[in-house]
């Protein structure tokens, strides 16, 4: 998998395929059950914080779940050269 492959897939996805062709909820984002939850004690309140996204199999090799800048779990891919973000239009 390389940058050209990812780029061409993304173009095909947006320009030749309907989003309805995909299970978009799981294809683009990581299911909640893939997250570790930890409890933090703050006074009398228990604060639940998502701190790790577990691996989920995607349609790309070398892809894994991690937090994006919005603190939601998204799909990222690692190539031999760099980390490539798969755009998530549903965030």
Curated annotation (Swiss-Prot):
Q: Which domain of life is it from?
A: Bacteria
Q: What is this protein identified as? A: Protein xpaR7
Organism of origin is Bacillus licheniformis
């Amino acid at each position: 998998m390389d940058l050209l492959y990812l780029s061409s897939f993304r173009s095909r996805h947006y320009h030749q395929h309907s989003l309805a062709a995909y299970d978009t909820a799981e294809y683009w984002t990581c299911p909640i059950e893939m997250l570790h939850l930890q409890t933090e004690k703050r006074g009398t309140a228990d604060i639940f914080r998502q701190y790790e996204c577990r691996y989920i199999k995607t349609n790309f090799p070398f892809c894994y779940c991690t937090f994006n800048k919005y603190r939601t779990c998204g799909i990222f891919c690692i190539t031999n050269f760099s980390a490539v973000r798969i755009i998530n239009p549903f965030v």
